[in-house]
């Protein structure tokens, strides 16, 4: 029998990621779906969340109001958009609910609001919840320390046509890890577009290239290129379930934290390696 002690609310339950999260919760021990939410006016309101996810009826009705399900969940998982996530964050902070944030595209003010809320609740805020991506970030840190000062560094990412922010949060996280390892400020050394006569490449720059096409789930490559050789570290996701499973794993982990902001490196204890 499933341990019902950790009840999870999924925001955006009818979306691609929301349905995968509901499936992941159903498959993982120690958690149960406590609430499923959709935006006001959605045609999915009133639907059974289990049926939406292709699992059959589970008795959880898709709701539009966090107030209505306040007592039905302990941890909220949010992979929506910045403005919605910040509204959900305020609710969770007020009612002392832990939060898993997979939303990307926050500006500096949004990131500051998340850090401030973490004074009162436990938050896992990560650009990518895939175990493989987070192992890749650790590898990038090590590669940058060995090769970064004498190679040209480029980050290439590809996603489906529906993704609305670029570069991806994961690509930016890759850049941050590399820049930090080299003692550089990513805001100062990042190059996001190249067009026309650009001049010679700045050897201290970190370049970004973006592809948006078809149904690509997510592909990320960091290239360390020297004269005569280059090293490429790549992660390719073939299913959103890898992100969903990681997010549910993070929800279990954060349930024991009263406050603080963490990422998947904390959840996976990667800094201990």
UniProtKB/Swiss-Prot annotation:
Residues holding NADP(+): 39
EC number: 1.17.1.8
Catalysed conversion reaction: (S)-2,3,4,5-tetrahydrodipicolinate + NAD(+) + H2O = (2S,4S)-4-hydroxy-2,3,4,5-tetrahydrodipicolinate + NADH + H(+); (S)-2,3,4,5-tetrahydrodipicolinate + NADP(+) + H2O = (2S,4S)-4-hydroxy-2,3,4,5-tetrahydrodipicolinate + NADPH + H(+)
Residues spanning the membrane: none
InterPro entries linked: DapB_C (IPR022663), DapB_N (IPR000846), DapB_N_CS (IPR022664), DHDPR_bac (IPR023940), NAD(P)-bd_dom_sf (IPR036291)
Alphabetized CDD domains for the sequence: DHDPR_N
Cited NCBIfam families: dapB
Family of this protein: Belongs to the DapB family.
Function of the protein: Catalyzes the conversion of 4-hydroxy-tetrahydrodipicolinate (HTPA) to tetrahydrodipicolinate.
Protein name: 4-hydroxy-tetrahydrodipicolinate reductase
């Amino acid at each position: 029998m499933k341990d019902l002690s950790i009840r999870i609310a999924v925001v955006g339950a009818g979306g691609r990621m929301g349905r995968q999260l509901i499936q992941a919760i159903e498959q993982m021990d120690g958690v149960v779906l406590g609430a499923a939410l959709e935006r006001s006016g959605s045609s999915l309101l009133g639907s059974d969340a289990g049926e939406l996810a292709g699992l059959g009826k589970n008795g959880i009705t898709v709701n539009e109001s966090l107030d209505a399900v306040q007592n039905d969940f302990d941890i909220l998982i949010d992979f929506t958009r910045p403005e919605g996530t910040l509204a959900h964050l305020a609710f969770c902070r007020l009612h002392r609910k832990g939060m898993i944030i997979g939303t990307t595209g926050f500006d500096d003010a949004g990131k500051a609001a998340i850090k401030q809320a973490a004074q009162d609740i436990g938050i896992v805020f990560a650009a990518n919840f895939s175990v493989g991506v987070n192992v890749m970030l650790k590898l990038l840190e090590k590669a940058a320390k060995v090769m970064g000062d004498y190679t040209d560094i480029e980050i290439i990412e590809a996603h489906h046509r529906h993704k609305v922010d670029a570069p991806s949060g994961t690509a930016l996280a890759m850049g941050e890890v590399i820049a930090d390892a080299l003692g550089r400020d990513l805001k100062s050394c990042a190059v996001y577009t190249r067009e026309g006569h650009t001049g010679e490449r700045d050897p201290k720059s970190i370049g970004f290239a973006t592809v948006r096409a078809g149904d690509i789930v997510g592909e990320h490559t960091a290239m360390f290129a020297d004269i005569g050789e280059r090293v490429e570290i790549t992660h390719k996701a073939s299913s959103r379930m890898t992100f969903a499973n990681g997010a549910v794993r993070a929800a279990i982990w954060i349930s024991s934290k009263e406050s603080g902001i963490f990422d998947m490196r904390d959840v996976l204890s990667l800094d201990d390696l």
